[in-house]
Amino acid sequence: MRLTALLSMAAKVALPHGYRYGTNRPWTIAARRLNPPGKRRRKVFVEPIANEDWPVVRGDTVEVLSGKEKGKQGKVAQVIRARNWVILEGLNTHYRYVGRSGDYRGTYLASEAPLLLKDIALIDPTDRKPTEIQWRYTEEGERVRVSVRTGRIIPKPVFQRKDGIVPQQWKDGPKDTSPEDTLQKTYTPSLKTLEEEVMEKMNIQENRRPRKSYWY
């Protein structure tokens, strides 16, 4: 595991009581604008689903079951478990202007709106049709998703970070620090100052003595 992954796991955002989740990350400016301090918003009731029972992960191929995009298949770009939302690449989009000013009308952009988990279904790799799933265990004890219609195992896609790096396929380059070097203890605490440690390491002898000074 790389150092950046360890630091991201250690960092946790403390959210106030009654915080309403959206499509933006809680630490972004857009999320703070929707949840200003002192403002109480109506509670949104969400069907509880355990993290280990979530049937869809980022990178899955699903089909839309209802709405204007019904029957279309797409790839899951983002999963928001706090609201049972799933965002698909290029589907269920709405258009808006961003950065509008007095003389400039702004940039016309497409933005994907979230879909509820009940409005999508996983695609069976056997026939490329939507299917319900069940959680089962293999002979090796691995918990997998199984299609109810065909009994085919639906494998999870390879985990890919936001920057496009696949941790399982990553190879350290000449400028990367290996985990072994990162975890190695190279500093020995002492009561010496930084200057004294540098002088000792470089074998510098300081024979000068400061003169006495007097304050009047």
Swiss-Prot record:
Q: Name one GO molecular function term.
A: RNA binding
Q: Where is this region: Disordered?
A: 167-186
Q: Where is this chain's protein located in or outside the cell?
A: Mitochondrion
CDD domains from the entry? Answer: KOW_RPL26
SMART domains on file: KOW
Give the record's keywords alphabetically: Mitochondrion, Ribonucleoprotein, Ribosomal protein, Transit peptide
Among the record's GO biological process terms, what is one? translation
Query: Transit peptide span?
Result: 1-9
Q: Which residues form the KOW domain?
A: 56-89
Q: What would be one Gene Ontology cellular-component term for the protein?
A: mitochondrial large ribosomal subunit
Record's subunit section: Component of the mitochondrial ribosome large subunit (39S) which comprises a 16S rRNA and about 50 distinct proteins.
Note the HAMAP family from the entry: Ribosomal_uL24_B
Q: To which protein family does this belong? A: Belongs to the universal ribosomal protein uL24 family.
Q: Extract the NCBIfam families matched here.
A: rplX_bact
Name recorded for this polypeptide: Large ribosomal subunit protein uL24m
Give the organism, scientific name.
Danio rerio
